[in-house]
Every structure is written in structure tokens, then in C-alpha cells.
Curated annotation (Swiss-Prot):
Accumulates mainly in the placenta of red fruits, and, to a lower extent, in green fruits placenta, pericarp and seeds. One of its GO terms (biological process) is alkaloid metabolic process. Its cofactor is Zn(2+). This is Cinnamyl alcohol dehydrogenase 1. Keywords: Cytoplasm, Lignin biosynthesis, Metal-binding, NADP, Oxidoreductase, Zinc.
Amino acid sequence: MGSLEVEKTAIGWAARDPSGILSPYTYTLRNTGPEDVQVKVLYCGLCHSDLHQVKNDLGMSNYPMVPGHEVVGEVVEVGPEVTKFKVGDTVGVGLIVGCCKNCRPCKQDIEQYCAKKIWNCNDVYTDGKPTQGGFSNFMVVEQKFVVKIPEGMAPEQAAPLLCAGVTVYSPLNHFGFNQSGLRGGILGLGGVGHMGVKIAKAMGHHVTVISSSDKKRQEALDHLGADDYLVSSVNEKMQEAADSLDYIIDTIPVNHPLEPYLSLLKVDGKLILMGVINTPLQFVSPMVMLGRKSITGSFIGSMKETEEVLHFCKEKGVTCQIEMVKMDYINTAMERLEKNDVRYRFVVDVAGSKLDQ
């Protein structure tokens, strides 16, 4: 099927200002280009970074803005040069929808680190149109930035894997923490953290959840399958656990001290930062020098890794713990997410919300 001759409209829920309140918004889709697919959105996960975007926490938001970057949908149209997909395929779209294709990261297939990457919302596409995300009934996306959902995987389960899942999988894969027998820590038990526990366990790791309080202990151990649980304020237990972990995945999205967690790492251990924090973090250099430890970061994952994590989770039977909501609940869901009142990922039933009615 070729390019659309007439622009189509989409109906989404958009923020109009830094209040972050979403309401219905009709806008024009860009034409389906030669390598584009048009996707009817079925489900879309709600990520903490959506809150940052709609509330202008990073000072870079443009309005109106339709958020949502854990998108699962059905292909309803393909451009004439599309080879990877056909009408009727169930597919996923993540945070990145464009890149330069010429820089070193692009040539190494780590396009998420391209300096000219295009975000799926709050950005401008190559044709000059604003990009809008998955809290909408339709999207048009270049085939390079679309992945096929494995047959037999529930689409609502696939949605969180497109951000939360690959965000954990990518650093474990890149830094060589993907063999069995390792000891890992998961700091923070939200949407990304709960996927960290499940994916690390599926890789055969001994997993310790680290939290600021004891309230999630039973959930972590009994429901998510973690092996141990540490409360960071209990000094005796933290000291007993010193030098015990190969890595820590730090998912906390607010400013917090690093030194208590650096002490848990073995020699050559890595503290991997994933939370978006807009204020400086502090530590004293001997904390890393005296164990050759590293503080590093990781940002989502490549398209290749996104495909890998989908198949990994399908093969290992890894599922996300989700709470399904309709679009008219989205503002309440965002308020609850800000209070960490969700176990563990909201997924919006976009198609079931009947946005066009």
C-alpha cells in the first residue's frame, strides 16, 4: 500500500501546560512515507519520564504534548518500501522514532545515543511536524523504529518491555552481566525496578532489592522472586552486605546519596544509573578508587536490544505486573504514579477507550 494522499487526523490526550493535566486533543498525522507504517494504537504504558515531560521538569517541554512511549498497536498501512511489516502485524514503538543514521552510534546500532535522535513526543520530525506519542489512536513511524511483538505474547504485557524492560536488559547485556551466577542489586522497586528483578532472576542472578523502607519486602521476596531485601537505613544490615554485589541497577528518579550503595559493590562492581535526575549527585572519590568501582549510566536500549528483550521475556515466561486503565483515568494514574502508588506499571487500554467517540 502506498503513501496516503490526504493527511489523516489522530485523537490523543495532550498536556497543554506544565500542570501536566491531559485532555482530548485532535491533530494531524504526517503522511505515511515510503518506509513508514501507520499503527492503530492498542495499548500504551505510563512511564515516570512521561511525568517529567508533561510537567516540564527538564525545562524542554513544548505544548500541546501527547506523551506515551511504550506503544503496542496493529499495523493498518505500510509504505511501498516497507519490508519488515505487513498490515495486521502486532508491533511496538518505543521512545525513539528517528536518528541521523550516519554517526558512530547509529553505525554501531546503538541509535539511542545518536545526538540527532528524534523522540516520539515533544520533538520535531524531519518534515517539521511535532512528534506525538502513544496516548493517541494512531501513529506513523518509520519501520526502523518499529518492532514485531512475538506471537503469543499478550500485547498489554509487551508494552512495558518497550521502555522499562529494555532499560534494564540493555546494561545487563552491554556490561556482560548476562551470565548466570552473578549477584545484583535493584535500587528502587517501581516500574523499571520490578522488571529489573524479573529479568535478572531470569538470567540466573541472585537478586537483592534495596529500598528506603521495609514496606515492599514481602512483595519483593514473595511476589517478584527476589532473593534478599535490604533497607538502606539499617546500617548493620548494609554493613553485612558490603562488597557483595557485582552490580546495582539504580532506578531512583530523585536525588539520593550514592555512597551507601557504592559500599555494597565488589571490586570492579558497577552502579548503573537509570533515573532521570536534574540535580547533581555527590560521592567522595575513595568510594570508587578503593574498589575500582564505576558509576555509569544507561539509556533505554537499541532497536536490536528491544527485539531481544521481547523474545527473552517470551522464552523465559517473564511477565510485567500491570494495572490496566482507560484513558479517562490517565490524570488520576499520573497522580498515583507520582506518589509511587502503582504495582508496578500502568498500561492504558487505548483502543478500548474509544478515543474517536
